[in-house]
Amino acid sequence: ESGAFLFGNTGETLASADLVIANLEGPITDHASVSETSVIGARDNYVFTFDPSIARLLHEEHIGVVNLGNNHSLNFGKEGVARTKAYLTDAGVAYFGSPLSEDEHFLIRDIRGTRVALVNYNEFVWQGKEKALADIVEVRGEADVVILYTHWGTEYVPATDKMKRLAREFVDAGVDLIIGSHPHVIQETEVYQGKTIYYSLGNFIFDQYFSPETTAGLLVRATYDPATEQFSFEDIPVTLKNTGQTVLTQK
């Protein structure tokens, strides 16, 4: 199937947004896939890479920015991160959350006159919390809105107490919205100090078909009103089919 097949009927929803942000769970490299030829459960079964054509596909499917701050972005080392950034740039897709200490970890974009800062918290890098807090402080004075994209927690279970403590600490530091990934299941949403926390959106395009929980995900349409300085949200559920296609969940 063509790459567009993977996105099913989500295209119109994605195209309607001013900016679509996604988590890219692995590097884009010229290397052959390791996990594809490995034994399920073996260590190398979790070494991911994407074909270079994926960068152009992301652009064609209206994904404008991707988060690189996750536990698979270094699967092919520094060279893998460098190739990923190059392929994304060539395709017109921006990125933030690089796991390399020498890179800038955040991105600020102007969206209809509102300066939006995208910051990453990656639980799986050294001093991830400290780096995220430093970035939040740095961008707080430059942006109208700070969105924190977190890669955190425990897979396949509800949000942990540790995640909830961290979320509050990040909001207290100046974050306006938290969007979480890594658990591969939808976790709860809560409001703290007037700020919304999505602990995990679950999967979007991923090959985990072994439970109802891993075949469910959320797209979140976040609309910011500069007059009130408040967000409103629409949760858009999606279903991952074992054909590899993701579709809007039928109501």
Predicted regions and their residues:
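Acidic, metal/ion-coordinating pockets
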Residues: 1-251
